[in-house]
Amino acid sequence: MRADAASFVPGKGLVADSEVTKTRRDAAPELSEAAKRLPTYQKKDWVIAGIRHNVVTVISGDTGCGKSTLIPQLVCDAENLVADDKVVVCTQPRRVAAITLAEYVARDRGQELGDEVGYQIRFINKFSENTRLIYATTAIVLRRLHSEPTLDSIGCLIIDEVHERDVYTDFLLLLLREAMANGRMPHLKIVLMSATLKAEDFAQYFRKVNGDTALKPVHIPGRMFPVEDYYWEDACEWIGFCPQEKGKGGKGGKGKKG
């Protein structure tokens, strides 16, 4: 199977405007108590308001605040934010992250993976016609742009870990900015999520798209759990053994001969 063989499958078609609110509200499950304790949940109204107001919304928040798991759900469940014939896609720079996040969110919502929440990585598509939220690698979305230049099947594209600045993400941001500035994606909302406070740089990059009335980046303070940095020396101390560095002598090393 080619990586670009499968499309992002939207919902079951267009519905009348008067039915959109009812359909979304009835279909959205109650968020779990664990999700409601996340710092992101406390800022949910600000987050949704920012996405409604802006074409491109920039969100920053500490690692562990719930950006990757909760914001895609909030967007998917919000009333009249994403049309029922379109999906919400959240990109991840790595395949493992796309899979584990999709599994966690599906389990948190009490659903089977591939039903309302799914994922798409190279050669593997785990979603159905009922899927509303798809976690996908950034490379997959780039391939989608090649076959679907205006991303008509996507209502909101969330680009996570944008601060990592890998080549796929940078290229995707460039293509999106040019397409939206030229009016080729009038239906699309874009959300950029960063774990650093340099969100203003990304907001400035998309100023041409958002215009002068754009809201400032949304910052989510706080994290659920403390994050500590550990290094190689710490691991050596824990296990009571430190492998000899390559090139420092020993059987397999390239140290100087005596």
Which residues are covered by each model-predicted region?
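P-loop NTPase motor module signature
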Residues: M1-G258
